[in-house]
Amino acid sequence: MRIAYLVNQYPKVSHSFIRREILALEREGLEVTRISIRGWDNDLVDEADLAERARTRYVLQEGAVSIALATAFAAVTRPRAFAWALLLALRMARRAERSLPYHLMYLAEACLILRWLRQAGVAHVHANFGTNSAEVAMLVQALGGPPFSFTVHGPEEFDKVPLLGLAAKIRHAAFVVAISSFGRSQLLRLVEHAHWGKIQVVRCGLEQTDFETRSDVDGSRDLVCVGRLCEQKGQLILIEAARRLAEANVDFTLTLVGDGELRRDIAALIDEHRLADHIRITGWATAAEVRSHLLRGRALVLPSFAEGLPVVIMEAMALRRPVISTYVAGIPELVRDQEHGWLVPAGDAEALAAAIRRCLDSAPAELQSMGRAAYARVRAQHQIETSAQQLKRLFEAGASEARSSQTG
């Protein structure tokens, strides 16, 4: 069976979980066509991402002429389907964040993608994120293409539910994937009970090799925070917590691994609080470099304000590192307070500082016990082969149902 993965930007530094999923599906025997709207010129640091870029077709890279010709061809050869897809695009634009011309462009992109899918013999399209890629997949189906599904990761999708038309996308999809029970609950709120059965939880998973490193916590005083430097990850609160620790003469260092739009603000706050001796920012890192930082660290700290379920938490737990994080979204489904680390209320710098101090004051034996429990927990819940098998069954069922409806 051949499927297509449709993503707005792929590969991307923060989208390693999509790459991991695609490769696991291929090991399960599926053929996967990679299609990305844009991103062929993204800055990439990981060799695996560079290899994926070479396997990916980029819609906008084809140019306006190719897209226009594909649109004209679809309008002439399948006028009824094109009219239905156009009506659907107009409906999606009615309350959308972006204006009508964007949605007409999504329709044009869908026309080109439809041609590619027919040439490749694709039986199902899966979009990652409930944003424009899911709308394009929906329009491909409306044009007469294969059934589609999409994964909602959060948190951005949940911030813009009406603007993204998530409810309409769910109603038209063969199925929808949520990466946590919390995520599923938010999607259930959007649609009638008749559609609830199509919303399935498939957790992101780690590779078998991610579980093979055996390294317990030693006497390190370094705390590691991995993630895009942005408002939802809560690094500004982490700097405030670090200030409290420094003022109390607590011995620690903090490594911020990542980059993003708040880097300048975070760096300014570090300077304002005179924390340069305690905190450093590395910028973007490869998967191997992230792993190295986690192994050198005492614990992962991720003080998120909004999340889906961060893959880096899984990676840290697989390396037997305790996790300090927040009671947000899917995080408590994986991390249990006092068992695998510490959970605190989001936005509470005092509670975060207290949790970090408890971690720093804990004996290595206690941290090692937490690390082993974390390892067992993530291994039981987040193996990529299990996730790929779940997805494969869903893809096959969706394609089978589509064939039955066509013959019936």
Tell where the protein language model's regions lie, with residue ranges.
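A conserved mid-protein helix/loop that constitutes part of the nucleotide-sugar donor-binding site
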Residues: S16, R221-R244, V250, L254, ...
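Nucleotide-activated donor-binding/catalytic signature segment of Leloir-type glycosyltransferases, i.e.
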Residues: A267-A285
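Short hydrophobic beta-strand element within catalytic cores of glycosyltransferases
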Residues: P322-S325, V335
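Aromatic "clamp/platform" in nucleotide-sugar-dependent glycosyltransferases that forms part
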Residues: F305
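A short, well-ordered alpha-helix in the C-terminal region of glycosyltransferases
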Residues: H278, E366-A380, S387-R393
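Conserved acidic donor-binding segment of nucleotide-sugar-dependent glycosyltransferases
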Residues: D337-Q338, W342-A349, R358-P364
